[in-house]
Amino acid sequence: MSRSTALLPLLLLSTAAVAHDHDHLHYQATSPAPAQSAPQRTPAERNAVITATLPEDQAAMKAHVMFLASDAMAGREAGTRDYDIAAQYVAAQFYAAGLRPGGDEGGYLQKVPLVAYRVADKGSAMWTPAGGQPQELVFGEDFVPSPVPNAKETSLSAPVVFVGHGIDAAPYGLNDYKGVDVRGKIVAFLPGTPEGLGGEERAFFGSAANKAALAAARGAVGAIQIDMPRAGGRQRPFATLARYYDAPRVTWANPDGTAHAMTPATPVLGTLSQAGAAKLFGKGWDAVVKAAASAKPAYKPLVARGALTVASKTGFKPMDSGNVIGLIPGSDPKLKDEVVVLSAHLDHIGTNDGGEGDRINNGALDNAIGIASLIEEAKRFKTAATPPKRTVMFLAVAAEEKGLVGSDYFANHPTVPLKSIVADVNLDMPILTYKFEDMVVFGADRSTLGPIVRKAVGAMGLPVSPDPMPEEGIFVRSDHFRFVQKGIPSVFLWPGQAGPGKAAVADFMSHRYHKVGDEIDQGIDWSQGPRFVSVNYAIAREIADAPERPVWNKGDYFGTLYKGPMAAK
């Protein structure tokens, strides 16, 4: 799973997120916590744990994780040979399970043309006040540039308008654009969101990419973020941004070799410091600083009298990867052309640079065990007494840890008609180190998938519990959200936190998440693997065989925003 938006430095909020709208979640420029590996054992002791005899169904899941989370896979980072080997393994398992290929040219693989992009120089920024002389904005003191995904060179000059947090969310009583004309202008906004938004909404509206999209829809020609520690929750000095200004980002490539951008006509140009903002907005900026320090900040629009000119260069490096796709055709004459997608990400974060000792982030729970569940779920479908009524797609995606890139590529280049996809059920990082007593299904309350999920989970003797971490905004942080952005009802499954779950999840997230300790011998309860698969299968089967396709609940924000099928009442 991608990192929480709360953990991201401002740099990535203003740059990496422009290509992938969760500020994603997946980038890591924060200082890493000290690595904690699995309990120290001798090689013989470790092998005894790994090779311990298990029942056949548990051993089948463990075998997948043994391979995918082995040191030989070097952390399965997308764009590497190690990931490619892992993808071939999944393709072979899909073949062995009897799935039909659903990728390119009759195969199981869908090529995903990844591209890394980064600022190629420090660029330049110049502020020319109305009737005054040009003033340079000093790199690292006033301004830090962002890479522009879809252009090797960028040069833009336009007036600037400050619009608070840059949010327009009418259902929540927020509209920073009220009475403001930003056509032909550069929009400047603060990071983060106002207080009072729920976790999912806060994560969504706080995304720099989504803010740029709002600006683009209103005719803005560019966007720039303004550093405000109180407003964005960040306490690092602005100079820290300069150290990471040229850190690479990853997305999928356009045919010309540039990178995909959500808002190609409205690039995020970089980040202004408070000193830089003061140069643009003069004494008017004092009111913003004062408001940011208040208990309940409220910002008024500001127009900078003059023009901001920004020039920068972006470099690109291609690095191919791939999704893995298998299909079980539907059996019902009326429903077989509709597709239920079951997704899980195959990649992890690779190896740590430098240092001594273990440097491999094996990703056993994140997300080798999710892929193992997907493979075993495919076997359940193939060996069932009757085939599903709808077609079921098993989708192992690349580059989730880079910003949901593989799923975004698939959503924009589907191998089946996009309109035929009726739902996505996503598996990402099930923490199976305890006997789970409930299930958490993120997004269940947003569509008619909710009753389907509750029926299936209830038949397994388990309750569906509410989101235990609403502040994390998990619904917008994994691959299913790329389907949501296409208007497709989607859910994301996790074992719940009842009983021992809360302590187990906290232990994993604190000590092994995105660290070298996420290994096969960390204490996984393999008896829970088949249970988790059974729950997933029951949910997917209910969706695949339901007489009606899922629709969004009437008035749901994301269903409305992305124009998905909506319930009548």
Model-based region annotation:
Residues 379, 383, 494, 500-562:
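His/Asp/Glu-rich mid-to-C-terminal helical/loop segments that flank catalytic regions of hydrolases
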Residues 137-138, 152-153, 178, 253-287, ...:
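Metal-dependent peptidase/peptidase-like ectodomains
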Residues 45, 129-130, 139-179, 258-363, ...:
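Soluble metallo-hydrolase cores and metallopeptidase-like ectodomains found primarily
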Residues 74-194, 303-304, 316, 320-323:
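Noncatalytic luminal/extracellular "stalk/propeptide" segments of secretory-pathway proteins
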Residues 20-86, 90-101, 276, 337, ...:
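N-terminal hydrophobic or amphipathic helices/low-complexity stretches enriched
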Residues 138-260, 329, 337, 359-362, ...:
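Extracellular/luminal Protease-associated
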